[in-house]
């Protein structure tokens, strides 16, 4: 019996990724890192800044996301996000640029506690990539 399921990641520009041989996905949900396997209970969750890890027979792929929504239903995982990058395609200059921007946003005196939390999460993740 196959232990694979389908994932589709969509951003505003295009269908970013569609894969049918996925064996596990780990997403940075607000509730914490969430591992999803075939036949997982149906879920809908918000994403926080972090790394989506996709495992398949061909290996592991990692993607940086800043936000989004994840839905798993009937062995189909859908991710809607406004910003996603394949980690192997991000150069150090882009990471530094995103980190500088996040650190500047963090210093804004008008930032809400919720936005401060998200910016701090983004900074932590970007520092691990840098």
Swiss-Prot record:
In its keyword annotation, does this UniProt entry include Transcription regulation? no
Answer whether the UniProt record assigns the keyword Ion transport to this protein. yes
Membrane topology annotation: Peripheral membrane protein
Which GO cellular component does the record give, naming just one?
Answer: proton-transporting ATP synthase complex
Q: Where found?
A: Cell inner membrane
InterPro entries in the cross-refs: ATP_synth_F1_dsu/esu, ATP_synth_F1_dsu/esu_N, ATPsynth_dsu/esu_N
Q: Which domain of life is it from?
A: Bacteria
Q: Which UniProt keywords apply?
A: ATP synthesis, Cell inner membrane, Cell membrane, CF(1), Hydrogen ion transport, Ion transport, Membrane, Transport
Which CDD domains does the record match to this protein?
F1-ATPase_delta (cd12152)
Named from the GO MF annotations, one term is:
proton-transporting ATP synthase activity, rotational mechanism
Query: HAMAP family from the entry?
Result: ATP_synth_epsil_bac
Quaternary structure, from the entry: F-type ATPases have 2 components, CF(1) - the catalytic core - and CF(0) - the membrane proton channel. CF(1) has five subunits: alpha(3), beta(3), gamma(1), delta(1), epsilon(1). CF(0) has three main subunits: a, b and c.
Which family does the UniProt entry place this protein in?
Belongs to the ATPase epsilon chain family.
Q: What does this protein do?
A: Produces ATP from ADP in the presence of a proton gradient across the membrane.
Task: State the protein's name.
Answer: ATP synthase epsilon chain
Gene name tied to this protein: atpC
């Amino acid at each position: 019996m196959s232990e694979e399921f389908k994932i589709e990641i969509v951003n505003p520009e295009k269908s970013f990724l569609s894969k049918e041989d996925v064996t596990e996905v780990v997403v940075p949900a607000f509730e914490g890192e969430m591992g999803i396997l075939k036949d997982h209970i149906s879920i809908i969750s918000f994403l926080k800044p972090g790394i989506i890890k996709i495992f398949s027979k061909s290996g592991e792929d990692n993607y940086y996301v800043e936000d989004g929504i994840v839905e798993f239903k009937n062995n189909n995982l859908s991710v809607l996000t406004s910003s996603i990058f394949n980690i192997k395609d991000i150069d150090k200059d882009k990471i530094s640029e995103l980190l500088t921007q996040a650190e500047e946003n963090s210093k804004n005196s008008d930032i809400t506690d919720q936005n401060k939390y998200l910016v701090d999460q983004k900074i932590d993740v970007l520092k691990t990539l840098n």
